[in-house]
Amino acid sequence: MPADYLEHHKPGANGLIEISTDYPDYFPVMKFARNVDVRRRLSLAFSTRAFPKNRDVLHQMMESRFAIAQLVGYKSWADYNAADKMAGNAARIAEFIQQIDDAARPVAQREIALLLAEKRKSDPAAKEIYGFESSYLTELVRRSSFDFDSQSVRPYFAYARVKQGILDIAAQVFHLSFRREENAPAWDPSVETWDALEGGKMIGRFYLDMHPRKGKFNHAEMVPVLDGVEGIQLPEAALVCNFAKPTADDPGLMEYGDVVTFFHEFGHLVHWLVSGQQQWAGISGISMEGDFGEAPSQMLEEWMRSPQVLAGFARHYVSGEPVPPALVARMNRAAAFNRGNEVMRQNSFSAISFDIYNTKPQDVDLAAVCERDQRRYTFFLPLEGEQFYAAFGHLSGYSSAYYTYLWDKVIAEDFFARFNAANLLAGDTSMRYRRQVLEPGGSQSANDLVKNFLGRPQNIEAFKKWLGEEFASPSSDRHPRP
């Protein structure tokens, strides 16, 4: 386990270390803990949160939504919910889920062979892998096959440097500037208030609520605060995250995945701010088709992989030395490993959210649907007794539309292929993207926004290249110029 994790999780009076199912506690254990029983027990605790109470709540929600869909003439909630999305109908969603499975399965099969070989080093008779083992085995393969240890980059990702780096990158890419307002009111003393400006003129405000505290939401999200209305009010939003808080002795070193999350959520934030100059609140910000909102945020994640971008902020917290280019190259290759399986995992969630809402609620056995779709769409086995749907919050908000994340990942990679990956901080593509994709908000259909920027509807080809990048030649050009 990382030294700073152990420092924050010391044994209590009874000699035991207490670990919660909150994300900052859970994910490092699943990734680094050698004790398989600890990982198994924590995984089962994580996947039974809010059970059985939320099982009944979810069934009630499913029944209400099905009744609404029936009242307005739709066969299912999934069909009703798709009507105002880019997908348009339930049949297109089912087709997309199969399309993703077809793309990811061959890559995932190659990855599973490596993961199983790694597991057999300690368990020679192993023939299968459980879901709770994936993160740990993936980390071991990254070390053995890609010469990369996730902990080797953490010293270069001190929270304060990452925050300033992302602010600087967003300012340069989207032609903005950011100014902190030290005395502005906020809901907690730890929350920072920032103004966004263009050409010296304020265009919006945002709040950074970035560290855990008691009773706080324990995931990461961009939260709209005010809709922007041209000439009446400026848009406001907050980033609510749970990154380790820096202290006098600890600069808040971040995992690679945490930095990616920061980029992702800041992508949502920029989208909200620059699209908040509409005539009507109803089309301001990200008030658009629900299966488009994750595309801009996922695209900004790609800046995290650029050696040029990282050189601007990723410095060792002790020596101040920039992250070595060779380490960045190994990091990117290692980060690409297990994409196939991760996409299949996300696709299984897409299938679960779709399947439970695409039929009559009384016909749905939640645990059975989850186990069936996990086995059908992934190579990992579930643990007996898992009831993860009870704490799968997207079944409430996204309901049948969890496919949105992969739908938008396809769009994001198609968008990113239009940028010069060798120089992401220059050129006019970023401003064309801002004007044609981000700024219109909900004033145009998302399908039109995509066509305006790409010159055509999205396709899956760039996504496939991204998906198989781990097995591509290191010298191959990821993004040939269009």
What are the functions of these language-model segments?
Residues 51-64, 441:
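Short, 15-30-residue, compositionally biased linear elements
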Residues 1-21, 34, 59, 64, ...:
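Active-site-proximal, well-structured secondary-structure segments within enzyme catalytic domains
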